[in-house]
């Protein structure tokens, strides 16, 4: 069956309701202290899901925020991995620039200010298909088992590959792609991290099913589970996607792949 209005489809709408709750609660004065923070980059009031942790108090509020949303939705609200990615990439890019004189940290700060100012949902994309897990990325029979650079240009890079099980990817405005394992020098083309808009040319999302998702469509008085809220995942495929230099945060500095993962 071809779905023309997927936004309101009963198997898909619940996941949209979940991420919408991260915006609704941030507008509620009752939850302002948990759901919002002051940006360390601009001094502006921002959604805590876009915040760089500055203290142990920030970390406690992060957990309390997640508990609150769990109570409100009883499901996945889809912005947690993106939030963790912000903090991991922020610190990692600083270390890379210190060693190599690159400009990844400034790239990332400019991107994050844009995310904060517009309260964007960003998917943290880390899990590659992997193929034969006994082999390194460069040893795979299919090179696209891990996201990798296939072309380097003066103005950016072209990437191919995929990321699996991307919760909330279809509801995200942007993706941050990161390595999924530590890598050696032979894998330097796979040591790549970047931001990419969801509607980029060459980016495809194959929507996945949820366990018991058809219960939300059944009639009668039988239990339909969590009817208003739910999850969704997608396989995100990159088919020769161009990434401009300003959105690149790692490009061949293989020894830092594990740093981002950690």
Feature map (PLM): residue ranges:
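A generic secondary-structure signal for well-formed alpha-helical elements
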Residues: 23, 27, 115, 119, ...
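Terminal targeting/low-complexity segments that flank the catalytic cores of oxidoreductases
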Residues: 10, 38-44, 231, 235
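Hydrophobic alpha-helical scaffolding
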Residues: 5, 101, 224-227
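FAD-binding core of flavoproteins
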Residues: 124, 129-262
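Generic structural signal for well-ordered, non-transmembrane alpha-helical segments
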Residues: 10-13, 17, 113-116, 158
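Acidic/polar, glycine-rich intrinsically disordered N-terminal extensions of enzymes
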Residues: 1-39
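Internal helix-loop-helix
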Residues: 24-122
């Amino acid at each position: 069956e071809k779905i023309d209005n997927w936004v309101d489809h009963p198997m898909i709408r619940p996941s949209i309701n979940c991420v919408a709750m991260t915006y609704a609660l941030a507008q509620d004065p009752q939850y302002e202290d948990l759901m919002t923070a002051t940006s360390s980059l601009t001094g502006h009031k921002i959604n805590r899901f876009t915040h760089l942790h500055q203290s142990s108090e920030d970390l406690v509020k992060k957990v309390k925020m997640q508990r609150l949303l769990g109570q409100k939705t009883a499901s996945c609200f889809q912005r947690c991995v993106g939030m963790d990615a912000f903090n991991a990439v922020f610190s990692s890019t600083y270390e890379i620039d210190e060693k190599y004189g690159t400009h990844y940290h400034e790239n990332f700060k400019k991107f994050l200010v844009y995310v904060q100012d517009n309260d964007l949902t960003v998917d943290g994309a880390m899990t590659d298909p992997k193929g034969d897990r006994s082999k390194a990325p460069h040893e795979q029979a299919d090179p696209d088992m891990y996201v990798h650079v296939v072309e380097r240009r003066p103005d950016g890079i072209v990437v191919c590959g995929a990321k699996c099980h991307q919760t909330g990817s279809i509801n995200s405005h942007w993706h941050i792609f990161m390595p999924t394992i530590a890598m050696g020098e032979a894998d330097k083309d796979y040591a790549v991290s970047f931001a990419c808009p969801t509607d980029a040319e060459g980016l495809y999302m194959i929507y996945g099913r949820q366990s018991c998702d058809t219960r939300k469509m059944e009639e009668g008085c039988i239990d339909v589970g969590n009817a208003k809220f739910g999850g969704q995942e997608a396989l995100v495929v990159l088919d020769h996607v161009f990434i401009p230099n300003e959105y690149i945060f790692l490009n061949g500095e293989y020894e830092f792949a594990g740093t981002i993962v950690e």
